[in-house]
């Protein structure tokens, strides 16, 4: 005879009041990841094109980055966030559309900084594709 199933009680995520934060947009050639943190660096909300249901080459589109940024902004606004500082990293196509989506969601953007790592002649790059 089966024992009665126990219900797992999950604690609700507490809503912190964080008025301003930092938005990190990482735009690679294959995906776009948006992370919103508090000024210290603790993650408040995150989203990516892949987590929003886009697969394969559709993850790298500007539209996928826009949808991911809107979702991330909605989660952060639930914590009372109103203004962000934006750090953009990477060469991907979702850079501008993710930034525009954050502004359209109602965030006041204090400043935008490009933090793409540029090698001072470091590792050898991968060879060119021949299609």
Curated annotation (Swiss-Prot):
This entry's Gene Ontology molecular function terms read: rRNA binding; structural constituent of ribosome
Name its GO BP terms in alphabetical order.
Answer: translation
Q: Cite the Pfam families for this sequence.
A: Ribosomal_S11
Query: What cellular component GO annotations does this protein have?
Result: cytosolic small ribosomal subunit
Which keywords does this Swiss-Prot/TrEMBL entry list? Ribonucleoprotein, Ribosomal protein, RNA-binding, rRNA-binding
Could you tell me which SUPFAM superfamilies the record lists for this protein? Translational machinery components (SSF53137)
Q: Which residues form a coiled coil?
A: none
State if Nucleotidyltransferase is listed as a keyword: no
**Source taxon at top rank:** Bacteria
PANTHER family named among the record's database cross-references = 40S RIBOSOMAL PROTEIN S14/30S RIBOSOMAL PROTEIN S11
Family that this chain belongs to: Belongs to the universal ribosomal protein uS11 family.
The record's note on quaternary structure and interaction partners says: Part of the 30S ribosomal subunit. Interacts with proteins S7 and S18. Binds to IF-3.
- Purpose of the protein: Located on the platform of the 30S subunit, it bridges several disparate RNA helices of the 16S rRNA. Forms part of the Shine-Dalgarno cleft in the 70S ribosome.
Q: What is this protein called?
A: Small ribosomal subunit protein uS11
The upper taxonomy is: Bacteria, Pseudomonadati, Thermodesulfobacteriota, Desulfuromonadia, Geobacterales
